[in-house]
Each structure stands twice: as structure tokens, then as C-alpha cells.
């Protein structure tokens, strides 16, 4: 326990702003000092400090950024948008995102900043009084983060880290050393889901301290702890891999499986302590570490703290400063039970001047660990600046570091190795530095691909023509379909690569290798090739790629391709960005730089960094007529790193260098192909270092970034100079002392117009003894620039036509080749350059070169001055040590070695290569070397530039003499000299089998592997044995394998046929009406599905439903057909908590239905059962133990709201009892129900008058929400998004719902606004005279409905507020209820009279156009005619009795109507007037005829139609009003008699609400007005009929009293009811209606409706004109869906929707 307390106190010292004592001081000194925020003794924050803190918070946060282009490229790869639409794109995908932070730094930082007394008394008590040692350890929780409206606008999530977050996520503030909580985890899945489907910029996640710690002293430490917590952002997006019922042959179909993950983190890791070699342990002893050849970058000294404070008074002032954070002070503390404590600084910069750093540590002789201070740069491994050995003194020591100026940002890390458990380390937080601070940098984003078999690979291994996944899902068609041309094997197509038209040979995609390349480039497949076998073809042939998208910013993008061809030709790859055009074309690669070009296929990998615009690539082949030249390119790829990875704010860098292997852990998933020097157990015997130009071309050398990228995944680690004479020179540190073999290759000279061959550079090899840590300087020569091909059209024409030099004197200033640069290997000792090995560069070729190849020249005497070559019009080559030459001359190495300029800027950009190459004119430029080559003085086009001279130091031993043979850029190869003393020749080389001795020519290695013998002395080899037995074995094995495969295939086919037959029989059995689906039993449902859903935070399942025994339920009469089956009125007894008997409405599910119908039926029961509100229809119980299944609902005698509003409209002859207060009360009831749903986070999605029910029609009525048909499918997926081809109520939906499929509680707000419009228009259809398509365009363009007639202004304002375009601008239902209450209290609102209806009665509004037998024939709207009798001999008696007539369409005088069979008996009587259909020829134009004598008012704005209750040909009922109770018809004998009497006495009626058409409304209006006498008679009849109806309703309903059971029958009714005790009910209808096949007021195109059974039609009277009402031949809109997507899908399980409110999305 004492050790724990001591450990805590010492750690507290690392966090507190003041530390005045060591661990051995008294307890008085252990009290903490006040922070800088409370120096003045008050808790009030200074406004200036707060303002400063807010500014600094921007620089102290950790910043994660996910580029928006990543979202685009991922969607392009998977061939589907990332919008959560699961139905349109063959399945969903899963998303996961979380943020991890280490808990220990956060816990210790926050605990150290709490109240000092509490911290001293309770060790680690939190601010809330938590005692971690005495109470049970809290359980850490995963924190869920959401998006605010501000975050949605900025695509930025700000995570404020504070005390409460750490307590919750880490389980308290105490660190349990035995089992610490490692990570604080935050779930960002919802944020990622939103961002993937949204638009806008990148997703940004920023970590910063919470606002209440804005005191500068506290905020600094919080920010430091956040940085030290090593935050990491994990993202994973994967396909759900759901099986598809159909197999698509479309190649552009999205891949079935894909799984990507990313991790965003700072790649810097903190190293372990190496074995220290420092011996500076004495007090006040100064030590300097200055390796040979290094500029002193740092120095450090170790002094006592007392002496330092006594001398430096500024540090004392810093200690007492009250400014909190200052430039020059930092502290970041992190600790782990596994790795020990360490501190980390922010990013610093010392760009212009050196800076210093003071670190205070506590030393004790008993410490076995060591303090180590590291210098960390992003592009380099951590460098140990100092390491303390076992100290011999006790006390505080100040370590002072002096850092040289550095161009790149860096950090300082100090760590302490902790061998023992009781080891402690103490740091004084008073670090001081004058280095400039930098803000935190963005982190990198690295991607991984998860194979189907579970293996993970890097993104770079995806789509690279190399199968790395076990099942091969990392390659294939989805890679080829990603970006055209980026993944091409030139097999089936050219992938968009097009040849550039020109003379000479052309690039072509060949199905097989050309004849000229078959011997050297064997290939079984197709490829892109060029062949110049026909004589006389010469010039340049280009092939160009498609235009590629630019990669992500700072992406590690690579281009890879395989190439094979002739060694005497030239193939190059160029890149052109769209913004620069052909003038900015850059060369990426040239085949002349590749060794062994003509010896098989070679894989070329090139970096593509820094691209910010669209670009294309171009292969260019230079063809001469001297010999046949052929090239082939295959398997071209752009790495997926280009589009799925980014390096953050930094350009791509080389991987961790070999020396850093001491500090970082190895990754088993990274495959290496070379053995890196510097790791544990590594040996230099087999290591080879290859240095090249890093991709640089021309007269200037490479940059550090180029070399970092070029040496990626290699064992080469160099530093590249950026200033002065060392610019472009590579510096390499010798790993150990031994003899090395150095091979230097000079660069070749450039080609001229007529000379197609380069002047070769010189290569030579020497052995040198090098010392460990010695710095070797390497300048790799670059080839001189070629005159051809040329980007200038005029010059390029000269190149193609091979013109001579005398055509134009102004163009003679050029055409020669630039001189090649020499390759230099040298050392710098005490500022003096010492050459070791110099390989000369080749001279440039003259315009029409006729020079002979010169011999190699080498210098060995260092006393010979290394002068520049002589320059004429063309420049001479640069030497070793000379003065500055003319501009066209190459510069000597001492001055930088840059190449010379061309003689004149006439478009001949033939500069000398880096390494002293001379610039060309008509004559060639001189080559670089120890002594530069001279150029011809009179610019003779026939003269080449001279080669430079080579050199080897006397300290070296020549191994290979100079030889001209390099036809490209230079190169340097360094490898350790092998110990070949055991070989007779003294020479050997290493192979995979070990060391192999060399032998001279005509000698052969003896069998002993050591000596060399004459090849003629070798004994004859014994004859090889016959291979007949091997061939026989192979043939037998092959035959057996083929036979096994045939048997296996046959077995599979037989099993498949058997299974197919069984499936067919099962399907036939399932389709049989006598089949009882056993899966629909309750036990099977629970086993297969067991649906569990969440309602308002509560989990619900089928077990929660109240089961009512079937014997307690009796059905009395039918109410109609619902969404699943018949709906009945019944009685239920024995239900706990309910009256007995109780009137209920029973919804049934037929026995023969699908599993999905069963699940939908249970879903609706679950939804309704979990709601308990006075304005929502109550579920009494269910009966699932027997078939058919029942749902028992409370009986609503008032019917649906829409029908009630239509029936009670005030009319001129019949005033209504409704008032404005009644309408407001109905609206308030529905709003209360919606508020309840909103509070329980439930989305109804279909708030409309047809889905609301009334308890009664008289006063005291209560409105309730009664249909949840559209709400039940929101629980089948994880997203509140309606997708696929579903029927949607467009006129009740906001724009985001029908455009994007997004449903929220604000969707119901919009629908409630439309419901208000329905209520105050008294049941009219919204958006009058507009079709669904017109409504889509109208609402999307900002249009809204006008207020209904006599609608009060405050009510219309509620509507308009509910119709706001932005969902967040719409009010919630609490606000809507308040506004409705205000309206009820406003006299100006409640006293507004209702509008008077002048149209027809509701029964006549419900007429529906019936479809004829011919689908192309127009539908007829049929209405009754009571007063006008049409004479006909074919009328039936029933037709005459009912007094009905038919309004016929006068389309043609020759049209004849076929007879219709008489009406069939129906088990239920309906209130609808019988209608008939008649086919009408569709070829004739529709015409309209108005009858002025009929009179009446035609409301063209609100024309409606409803289907009849009959069944159509496909067994789909054509009239369904409300799916909760079905069709509301009441078998009231008095009302039927009244209707019959009305038909006999009423006059002709014209429908008041017509039919909306698809695309546009075609209505036929009758003439307005009747004769006055006929009108008065009609009014009187209607008034009498209305009075009779009022009396009957009052007698039947009274004042809306509670529902009571009907009078008992004469026989006594038993308490336990049974269906047998009541009158028989036609229950056969439960089997007649198949589950789910319910029509919704429409028919599919081409499926005519069943003709209605009615009286036979009479022939038209000659000359008689009849009123007509026509619709289009294609059918009304309610008889077919509006097609938004191609194809028509009618879902039989969708909820019923009335009128024209359905569309297919």
C-alpha cells in the first residue's frame, strides 16, 4: 500500500504545474500548488484567459478527417450509392465506426487536477466523492455519439473530453493497476451512416477538452492527455452478402461480397529503450556526440537543478508565471502498466534558428531504469538524443538540449524504462524551450480489405492481378468495372486505351503474343503490343489511356504494368494532367533505364504522387528502321491506394526504415521480399543496396520526397540534400566497418534527330574499406535529354520525317543530344570532398552523328585536376573541382553538378543530365566525370560530345575496369565483399543455396565446389533413366481424376433433379386450398421468427400479446374486407379487465397465406397492442392458437373519418349539425394520438382521414388513429427508410419522403397538415385536379395547397407550418396541440360557419369507372337515373323496379353493347348502386356532351371515384376503405328501404367528384343548372329524405352512448359463448379470400376488372342524346399505379390507400 501511495504521489508530480520536492521529502512538501487559473485566489475566470483559451483550443485538438472522395470512389467500386437503400441495390450493407482512446492518460490527468485536499486524503477520489478502493469498481460503458444540426451543416463532429465522459467510458478515474481499463470507446456508427448517405465535404472528428476547463492551465493538460491517449478512429463498411433469387448476367452488377475497413491514427509509435552507450553520469559534466561527417544537430549537457536555477534567472520567472500555457512550455504524460511512463511534446519547428530545450528529471542510485530522450520526425525513425545510465547522485538534474535548425516539424519524447514493478520516474513539468510550436497534424487513413475467408490484406493488394484471398474475391470483374482502363489485361476489350493516330506502326490489342516476341516474351493471354517487323517503318507510336480521376490528396498512388520487348528500342511512359495539357507532359519511365530489357517480362512499379487534376497516361515507342523492334504491355493497374487511402496532410513517405526495427513491433501481415539490415540477427553478408535517380530526370537531382517514395519497401534509407552544393545528393550511413564493393554506372548521353542510339555511360567496380557510421555521399548521374520525340509540333515533325540539318538555319540551333551526367561516390572529411569512385557519363550525340565510339578513359592520380570540359556553342561536361562554367556547360560536383542549358530555346529542350552533363546544340553536349568531356567548338552537327573520364581513389581496389555499357540513367550498387578465401579463384557469389565459387573462362567448378577444372576433363554424365513409367503414372492419375469428377457431377445432377421434383410437389401442395401451413402455427412462429421489436424503448414479442381462447369469441356479422381478410363484429367474454360480454371488431387471417403475411399480421397486432392512449384504437387481444388467426380490436361504431365528413357536409337543402368546434375537437384528438406516437419515437407514415375512426357519429364522438399498415414494415430493417417498389401515399408525404425515402416524426407532421386540410374541406381529396405525378412536381417546386373554403386563418397557418420544406422547421405535435387549443379559445375561429355543399350527395360521389373486358377500351362512369325512364324491351324486372338507367357513351353510331348476364346473389347487401361495364372502341376519340337540362353543380376540383365491393377476375376486391375494419357497411333494413325509395323518387344525379387521370385530368362535365321547376322539386325530395335519415340516426345512436350488447335472444344466452349458439355467419369467406391479395383501388395494366353483375343494357334510343362521363382508355389513375421505376410490382400486403394517393417508388 505504501508503494501505491508513493507511486501515485510521484505521478501527481508529473501533472501538477509546480513540483518543489523529491520523493524523499517530508509530507508537508507533498501538498499541491494552485494552478495558474487560481493564482489570484478566486475561482472566477478571466475573460482574457477564456478568449485566449478558445483560440488555443483550435490548435490543441486531435483531428481526424475522412475525405469525401473516399465515399465517391467506394460507391463507384461497389456499384451502388451509399444511401442505405436496401431494396433497389440487391441487399444492404453494414456500417461500423468507433473511436478508441487509452484510458490511463485521461484518468491520471483528470484525477491530478481535482481538488488537492481530496486527492491527498482519498488518493484518487473523483469530484463526486467516489472512493475507488472501497466501492465496487464501476463498469465502463461504450459512449454513443450523435449529430447535431450544426454538425450536419459542417460535416464535423466535435468530441469534448471531460471528467464525466472519462468516468462513464473508463469506469471511474482510478487506474486499477492489476487490470486497468485499456480503452475508452465511443460509437460513431450513426454518424458514419448519416455521412455516407449525405452530401458535402469530408467528415471531420475533432477531440478537444470540454468547455468548463477553459482555464489555460487546465486546458493545456487536458489537451496533452488527449494527445497522449493515442486516439484511433476505426471504420468498417461491408456488404450483407444476402443471396439473390435471380442471377444477373449484367457485368455492371455490384459485387455480392465486399468488406473494407480503415483506421485513422498517428503512425508515430513510441520506441523501446535500446542499450545505452552513454558514459556521462557525473555531475556538471558536459558531453557532445558528433559523429564523423555529421553537422552537429544537437548537443546536451547534464547539470544539477540548483546550479541551473541559480545561473538562469529566467527559469525562476517562468516558474512563477501566471500566464498558464506559454510558448516554450509543454507537458504530455502517458503511462501504461505494460510500457512504462513517457512524456510527449507537441509539434515544434526550428526553421530559421537553433532552439534549446530544458528537461528536469529526478535521479536516484537505486533506479535501475533509464531516462531516454527521443527526437521524432515523421519521415525518419526516432533518434535517441540521450540516455542516462545508473546515477551516482541523488536529486534533481536539468538536461539541456541544443537543437540545430530543422526544416521539418519534430517532437520530443522522453521515456523511462521500467524493469521492476516498484520503479518510479519523476519529471518536473517545467519544461522550457524556445522552439516554435505547431498545431497538431492530421492523421493518416489506411485501408484494409477483408477476404471472404477471413484473411485481411492491404488495399494495395486489391485488384493487382495477383490473387491474395483464399477464394479469389480480391480480383475479378468488379476490379475491371471500377474505373475504365485502370485494371486492364487487354483481353476482351482495350479498356479505353486508344492508339494515337500517326504514321508508322500502331499499338494494337493482340489476342496472343506477336511472332517477333514469342521467343523472348512468352504469354498465354492477350496483351497490348506494337510490332515494327515491316521494313521502312519508323517514327514514334503512342497509345493513350482514358482520362482517370485524380487520387485522394496525398494518396500513396502507384501505377504497375508488365513490359517486355526489344533491348534496342525505346519505350517510355508519360503522364499529362488535364489542367496543363500536352505542354506539361512529364516522363515517368523509360525502358532504356531498365537493365536486361530484352530478357523476358519485367514488372514496373512507378509512384504517382501530387496529382490534383484529371490525368491520362501515354505509352510512347520510338521505332527506327534499322531493325525489327517490338514491345508488349500487359496487366496494367492503378493501385487501389490511389482511391481508398490517404496520408493526411503529409505527402506519402517511405516506410519505417531498417534502423527503426529496434523500436517498433513487426506486423505479421506485411510481406517483405528483402532482408533489411539493422534488425536483430540481420547479417550484411547477403545485403545489397541499390541507389538510383529516384525518378528524377533532366538537369536537377531528386528531392527528398521523390527518394522517400522511390525507396519505399526497400532497404535503402538515405537523406537527400535540399540546399547549396549538396542539393539532390543522397547521403547514406555505413552500417558497419568492413570492405564494401561499390559499382558505379554513369548516365548515357542523349539521342539526336538522326542518331537513335545513345552514347553509353561508363560503369566500373571497386572495393573500399568503410568505417561504421561513416557518411557516404552519392550523386547518381542522369541521362542527357533526347532531341526526339519532341512536344513542339514543328520539332516533332522534323523528328518523324528524319530531316537533314540543312533545311532551316534558324532551326539548326539544336537537334543534338545532351551530355550524360557522371556518377560520383565521395566522402566529406572536415569540409573537404574526397572522391572514391567516379563513373563517367556519355557525351551527347550530334544532329547527324558520324563520330566513332571513343574508348574509356580513367584517372587514378588525385593530383590531376578535375576540370570542366571545353564549351563551344554546345556545353562541355562538368568536372570534379572547377569554377562555374558558361550556362550551357555542366557544373562541377563541388558546385552542385547540375546539367547545362541548351544553346537556344527553339523548342529543342536538350539539357545536360544531372551530374555535370553539358547542354546540347546542333552538336552534342559533353559528358560529366572526373574531367568533363569537351563539346565541339564550331557546332558541327556531325560531332558528338566527348565522354567524361572515370576515377578510382588510390584507397580503393579495382575490381572491374571501366566499360561503356550504360544506356540510361546512372546507378550505384553497394554490397559487402564476400569472404571467398576458400575458393581456388578467390571469387564467389551468393545464391539461394549458399556461397558458390567463380571460375575463369574455359574452367568449370569441380564437384567439390572449391577448385576449378578444365571442362574437357569432366566425365561423361550417365544417361538419364526412361520416363515412360512417369508418363504412365500421370496418364493413370489423370484418368482417375476425370472419372471421379464425372461421377461427382452426375451425383450432383441426380440430387438436383430429385430436389427439384420434391420442391415442385411441395409448391403444388402449398398452393392447394386444403393445405394447412404448419409453419404458421404459434410454436413454429416462435421457433422460426420469434419477432422482438422495440416500441418506445420497450421490447415487445408475441408472448406479450393477450391470448383469448377461441371458445370465448363469437362472430355476429360481417363488417367488410380488411388488409388481410374479412373483418367481423363479434362478442368476446372472459377477458380479464374487460366487460363481459364485450363488443369487438375481429380481424382475421385466412388459413392459406404466406409466411410474410403471418409476420405482417403479428406485426400489426404487436404495434397496436403496445399503444395505450385514448386516441389510438385499442387492441383487446389475439387468438393465435387456432386457425384462422384473430385480432380483437375495440369496436368503433362511427366509421372512418373521411366517410363521416362527406356524409355530414352542410348542404343547401340539408344543414349539418357539425360546427367549427367539432372539427377542431377531431383535429385535437388526432394530434393527441400523434403526440403520443412522437413521444414513443414511433413513425406512423400514413396519417390521413381514411385511417382515423370515430367512436360514434353523434355528439361526444372521439377520433382515434386506427390503421398502422404502413408502419409495420419499418421494423424489418435497421433504417427508417422506405425503399423499393412500394405503394406510397404521395399526397400525404413530404418531399424528403417520396424523393429520398426518409421517414421521421416530421413526416407525420406534414401528413397531419394534409389531414387538417381534409377535415376543414369536409372530406375532399387533397391537391384537387392534380395527379400523383403533378403533385410530386408541385410540392418539390415549393407549391402548397390553398386553404379550404371558410377555413380560419390560424388553422391554415398550422397547415402551412406543417408543410415547411425543411423537416426541422416543422413544429412538433406538442406545439400543434397548443395552437389548436388557442384556436378553440378564439371566438373568431370557432364562430366561422362551415361551407355549404351544392354538389351531389355522398352516395353519388362514390361512383367508380369500371374497366371493360377489352383493356384498351375506355372506362365508363355510371350513375343512377331515377326520373327519366329509358324504354327498352330487354329490361329485367329488377331493373324496372329499381328505376335505374345507364348513361351511355355516344362514341359511335355503330357501337353495340353486348348483353351482360343478370346479377348474382351476394351474401351481403351493399349500399352502392349497381354499375355495369361496356366495351367501347379505343380507336375513336373521346367526346363529351353536356345536358343543360340535368342541372346540378359539378365540382371539377374534387372529383372522386371508389371501386365497388365486387371481386374482380383475379379475386381482388375492388372496394376497400379502411384496412382496420374493412368496408363500413351496415345492414340496416330501414336505411336500405329508404335508399330504394330514394332511387324511385330522385331525379338524375351527376357525380360531383370526378376521376383524376394519369398525367392530366380528363373530366366530362354535365351542363350546369336545371330548370327552376325541376330544381325545386328535387330540393323538396332531398329535404324530406334527409329528415327521415336524421330521425333514424337519432333513434339508432342517440347521444353517442357507450356501446352495449344487442338485446338478448329469446333463449337465455349462456355466459360462455360459442359460435354454434348464434345465428350462422358465412365464415366460408375466411377461406375465399387468399391472404394478401387485396386491391387498393387500382389494377395492373392489362388486367381488366371483373364486369359487375347487373341488368342487361337496353339499346340506345334513336336520336336520343345521353349524358356521358368518359375517362381515358388506359384506365383511371386509381386503377393502375404511377410508375416511377421501370416495371410494375403490386405488393398485396401493403395497406389500403384510397383514391389517388398511391405511387410506386
From Swiss-Prot:
Chain positions recorded as ATP binding sites: 1119-1127, 1147
Location(s) in or outside the cell: Cell membrane
Regulation: Inhibited by ALK inhibitor TAE684.
Broad class of the protein's primary localization: membrane
Coiled-coil annotated spans: none
A Gene Ontology molecular function term of the record: transmembrane receptor protein tyrosine kinase activity
Extracellular topological domain residue ranges: 22-1035
Region (Disordered): 842-892, 1395-1499, 1505-1524, 1532-1557, 1588-1613, 1646-1681
Biased composition (Low complexity): 1532-1544, 1588-1602
Tissue expr: Highly expressed in the developing central nervous system: highly expressed in brain, with much lower expression in heart, caudal fin and testis.
Glycosylation sites: 40, 48, 124, 259, 334, 434, 442, 458, 484, 578, 590, 635, 717, 808, 881, 979, 1014
Domain of life: Eukaryota
Keyword tags: ATP-binding, Cell membrane, Disulfide bond, Glycoprotein, Kinase, Membrane, Nucleotide-binding, Receptor, Signal, Transferase, Transmembrane, Transmembrane helix, Tyrosine-protein kinase
EC number: 2.7.10.1
Region annotated EGF-like, chain positions: 980-1016
Domain Protein kinase, residue spans: 1113-1389
Protein name: ALK tyrosine kinase receptor
Hydrolase found in the keyword field: no
Record topology, Cytoplasmic segments: 1057-1705
Organism: Danio rerio
Biased composition (Polar residues): 1484-1493
Compositional bias per record (Pro residues), positions renumbered to this chain: 1603-1613
Region (Heparin-binding region): 54-76
Gene: alk
Cellular compartments per GO CC: plasma membrane
Membrane topology recorded in Swiss-Prot or TrEMBL: Single-pass type I membrane protein
Family membership: Belongs to the protein kinase superfamily. Tyr protein kinase family. Insulin receptor subfamily.
Catalytic activity as recorded in UniProt: L-tyrosyl-[protein] + ATP = O-phospho-L-tyrosyl-[protein] + ADP + H(+)
